[in-house]
Amino acid sequence: MWTISEVPIQRENDAESLKEEVAEAWAFVKTQPWLFAGIAMFMIWHIGDSAIEIGIPFIVENKGLGAKEFGIFGAVGAGGAMIGSLLAGIRPIPQKTRGLVFYVLIGGIAWCMLMWAMPIPFLLILVFVLIEGILGGTLGVIWRTTMSDSVDQHLRGRVNSLDAIGSLIFIPFAPLMGGWMIETTNVLTTFALAVSVMVLTTMAGLIVPSFRRFERIETDLFPIKDSRTQSD
């Protein structure tokens, strides 16, 4: 591997600096309503999601359970995500309905999270954890597929970076807020408020047609190239 020479990547109008590369990616994001809305919504959505994650150990503890059950909780969610990813890979979502399905799944995830805090048996909570994992796994495949279909290869890494920054930017703040709310009120109230924020935020994706239309919009600055392929 050390002896293999580096093959330079040839790009048209290659950006000369990191600042220019990020500016180019941001310029592309602003031309795509579905992408801009998705990044903006997840900036807010992850505030509620992170606050909920802080409350999970208290849910387990309040039921008189311990670390083993907390581990089972995490394992069931991860298993659900694997199932969801597999199902979405076997039966891809058609592009024309991809955005609608995406935002419906987000709402489903939020409601499943609210059920975790309800006074129900732990086994029933695990059912909702499994469903949340399946929906989340499917959601991830839809978003990654759309990014692959709609973003040119030379922009994909930078756009993915902006997407990740948008998702993570409020996460350092959200656990602090979640812990404070749980301490001040209780787990159920915190979960209810977090889910309300998550659902209200993503409602825009269902209401505004351009947000749920997961299709590349051609512009003079970013024309659609014939070589770019679309997934089913």
Predicted regions and their residues:
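A short alpha-helix capping/helix-coil boundary motif
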Residues: 4-5, 34-37, 49, 67-68, ...
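C-terminal transmembrane bundle of multi-pass solute transporters/carriers
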Residues: 23, 30, 44, 56-57, ...
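Juxtamembrane intracellular "pre-TM" segments in multi-pass secondary transporters
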Residues: 6-39, 223-232
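Charged, solvent-exposed alpha-helical segments that act as regulatory interaction surfaces
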Residues: 8, 35, 53, 212-213
